[in-house]
Every structure is written in structure tokens, then in C-alpha cells.
A protein has these predicted regions:
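Nucleotide/pyrophosphate-binding catalytic subdomain
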Residues: 1-223
Length: 223
């Protein structure tokens, strides 16, 4: 079920998005190759992901101008993955690779929504979500980061960010500890002072359609 048509723009909304399964599968293969220091294999998987992304865009976005803009945005993160593989394969953290895949997923949804006339902005969760020294979410600093971030953002009804990714006190990419989708989404919503979270499960980018299904909505007390 493609849910993008059901995403409304009459109220301000923050979409907390999982990495699409097709992309996550590719990211896992890249990470496995890097773990074994098989750089050539890792780069082949990066190229395979790039080819798939271009194919999906050709299927999804009919406007040539919009498609070219989407390709440009996504290729930036493909190149960053390739650079990580080439420059420091023994030092690269697979969470940095995961972060690139998550951003690419957000960009896919962003450009598809724009094609439907729904203006939006992609926010990198690592730019505002922080863990404290106790490895628990630092809500005070996260809220401050959001306030600063929003000052320079366009006034749009939809914001898209990534699920579970954040930064620790050492400015390293990491994952929010514990919890599940309800918790992660509610945490992000709390940072934005939202009153309700609508949860979606995300599938893949298959046959030119983003697969998402709305499961339920929850208040922060329920989460």
C-alpha cells in the first residue's frame, strides 16, 4: 500500500522514517564487506545501490527536472559511502554507512511528495538528536538543537527525519538505545513538541512505489 497520497499538508507534521528494506539490505551487504576488509566487494555493492536508486527514480518520478534534482541529491550520499569505503575501511563505523542509507530513504520520500505538490524538508536526525554521557536521550540539548535548526529552515508543512539515528557526546553516529518504533517516534515528536504521533511501517521501493502502511496513532503517554 502506497501511503504518500494519504499524507496531508493541512497541519504541520514530522515524519519519522525507517530505512526502506531494499536500501537496508544493500547497506547490510556493504557493511559485511567492510567488516571483512573486502573493499572491492563493498564498492560493487555501493554501485549496485546507486544503479537501483536510479532505476527506482526513473519509475517513480515522471518529471525530468524533478528526477534530475533527486538524482543529484541521492548521488551525494552514494559518493559519501564510496569515500568511506575507499578512505578508511578499517576505521569506518557501519553506523555511518547506515546513516547514508537512512538519508537516501528520506530523500526518496521527499521528492515523491514534492512531485505530488507537497512541499517538505528533510532533517537529519543526527543534527539534533543527542545522547548524554549516560547514553540516554539528552532531551534538553535535542530541543535546543531543533530550535536552532528550525530558524534556518523553510516554512513547510512536512518535515522528514530518520528513525533511531542520533549523535553521542563524542559526535559519533549512533543508535538510540532500547525501545522500539513507538518509542523512537514519540521521542522525536517530543523534541518537536508534537501532541500525537502517527506510526507507519515502511517496506521497500518496489516497482516504482514506496511501500508504507499506517498502523496506528498514539499519544506520548501511550508511547
Amino acid at each position: 500500500v502506497c501511503m504518500t497520497e494519504n499524507i496531508k499538508t493541512d497541519i504541520s507534521c514530522v515524519i519519522v522514517l525507517d530505512t526502506f528494506t531494499d536500501i537496508a539490505d544493500k547497506i547490510q551487504k556493504i557493511s559485511i564487506s567492510l567488516f571483512h576488509i573486502e573493499i572491492e566487494d563493498a564498492l560493487k555493492e555501493v554501485q549496485s545501490l546507486s544503479d537501483d536508486c536510479m532505476d527506482w527514480l526513473n519509475r517513480m518520478i515522471v518529471s525530468e527536472g524533478r528526477r534530475e534534482e533527486a538524482e543529484k541529491d541521492i548521488k551525494i550520499h552514494i559518493r559519501q559511502m564510496a569515500d568511506l569505503c575507499n578512505e578508511a575501511p578499517r576505521l569506518v563505523d557501519d553506523r555511518d554507512i547506515m546513516a547514508q542509507g537512512a538519508i537516501i530513504s528520506s530523500l526518496f520520500l521527499s521528492h515523491l511528495l514534492r512531485m505530488q505538490g507537497k512541499e517538505n524538508c528533510v532533517l537529519r536526525s543526527c543534527n539534533f538528536l543527542r545522547l548524554g554521557v549516560d547514553r540516554k536521550p539528552d532531551m534538553e540539548n535535542s530541543r535546543k538543537n531543533v530550535e536552532e535548526l528550525m530558524k534556518g529552515l523553510p516554512d513547510v508543512p512536512l518535515y522528514i527525519t530518520q528513525n533511531a539515528l542520533c549523535m553521542n557526546v563524542y559526535n559519533e553516529t549512533c543508535l538510540l538505545p532500547h525501545g522500539g518504533t513507538d518509542y523512537y517516534a514519540a521521542l522525536t515528536g517530543a523534541v518537536f513538541h508534537a501532541t500525537e504521533v502517527v506510526l507507519y511501517t515502511s517496506g521497500g521501493v518496489l516497482n516504482g512505489n514506496i511501500k508504507m502502511r499506517q498502523t496506528h496513532s498514539i499519544t506520548f503517554g501511550e508511547a
